[in-house]
């Protein structure tokens, strides 16, 4: 993996795996109430994430607090993956 190849050079390789985040790119989905609700229901918090909620994870992985973390995917998906991970689109 890239993490194992670059680790000896002190490079850490990690990723953030966000759930559904309220951004301009997701506005088309958000504008359709059935679809918005279907995505929100997959989070254990029953809502979409804000961009601000992604920042802490990025800061952590970029900081010295994660100096021994590499080759990791950090799921910031409101529990979607832990609860189920599947998506059933609304019937419209």
Regions found by a protein language model. Give the residues of each.
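Active-site helix adjacent to the Tyr-X3-Lys
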Residues: 1
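Alpha-helical segment proximal to the catalytic Tyr-Lys
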Residues: 4-8, 67
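Short, conserved catalytic or interaction motifs in soluble domains
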Residues: 8, 18, 63
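Rossmann-like NAD(H)/NADP(H) cofactor-binding core
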Residues: 9, 14, 72
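C-terminal helical subdomain
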Residues: 15, 34-65, 69, 76-78
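Short, flexible catalytic-loop segment of classical short-chain dehydrogenase/reductase
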Residues: 17-28
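Amphipathic alpha-helical segments that mediate coupling or scaffolding at interfaces
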Residues: 28-29, 42
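C-terminal tail/cap regions
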Residues: 66-69, 74-92
């Amino acid at each position: 993996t890239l993490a194992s190849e670059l680790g000896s050079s002190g490079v850490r390789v990690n990723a953030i795996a966000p759930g559904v985040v309220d951004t301009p790119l997701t506005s088309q989905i958000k504008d359709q109430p059935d679809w918005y609700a279907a995505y929100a229901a997959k989070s254990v918090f029953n809502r979409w994430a804000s961009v601000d909620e992604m920042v802490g994870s990025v800061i952590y992985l970029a900081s010295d607090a994660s100096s021994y973390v590499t080759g990791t995917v950090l799921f910031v998906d409101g529990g979607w993956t832990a609860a189920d991970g599947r998506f059933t689109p609304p019937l419209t």
